Amino acid sequence: GKPISHPGLGEGGRYHVQTGRPPLPGSVTLTFALAGNQNCGKTTLFNQLTGSNQHVGNFPGVTVDRKDGVTRGHENTLVTDLPGIYSMSPYSSEELVTRRFVLEEHPKGIINIVDATNIERNLYLTMQLMELDVPMVLALNMMDEVRENGGSIRVNEMEAMLGIPVVPISAAKNEGIAELVDHAVHVAKYQESPGRQDFCDAGEQGGAVHRCLHAIMSLIEDHAEQAGIPVRFA
């Protein structure tokens, strides 16, 4: 099939926000968490990103494999393949590992891989990851299957709604990977956090959901700050 078309950096599309921040020094290693649901092509993407430049170990305290790899063509970029999970609730060892990695190891960015054929289920984790306020890019995987089934996804509208770059890819066919890396490196280098999405504002500003959410946030704000956790995630 034909390659997946998508605007590259500076070629239009929604997500080209300039934060005004200077880029991180070239000596800084750009570390990325690769996160996503089970069976969404995450391991395939990790292999495409890193090739044979991989190291397999264990996360401390649990029998969960940890895979780290240097991104091909970017010697100063390191990707950690996190276990496949459906939420950030720390109920399983896999969820606990992912939560600890993002909150305690402070990656410079998150690559969230999403199954384009099952977006609704995948976006629950996406929204939780966005609340961590870490620079993030969404890899919309299996777009070749969507295309072959005659479907389409309005990627630019999705970017506008989420406030993060959304890059259509096919990890299995090695399509869109270079663009994904370009966007991931960009948001990490310039520390572009996800756009603030307050979906409880969908109706009136003073709606009940909005009032309840912000009342809770005011109660836990100090505790979240002490724990070093973004208040919306807490």
Predicted regions and their residues:
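Helical mechanochemical/support elements of P-loop NTPase systems and associated helical scaffolds
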Residues: P60-K67, L78, P90, E94-V97, ...
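Conserved C-terminal guanine-recognition region of P-loop GTPase G domains, centered on the G4
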Residues: G69-T77, V97-V167
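Conserved G1/Walker A P-loop phosphate-binding module
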Residues: G1-S92, L103-E105, G109
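Canonical P-loop GTPase G-domain recognition
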Residues: D144-D201
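Residue-level signature of catalytic and energy-coupling elements of molecular machines
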Residues: A33, L45-F46, V64, V79-D81, ...
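Extended helical scaffolds that flank P-loop GTPase cores
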Residues: G163, Y190-A234
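Flexible phosphate-sensing "switch/lid" loops adjacent to ATP/NTP-binding sites
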Residues: T44, T98, M217, E221
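Conserved nucleotide-binding/hydrolysis micro-motifs of P-loop NTPases
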Residues: S52, G61, G84-Y86, A116-E120, ...
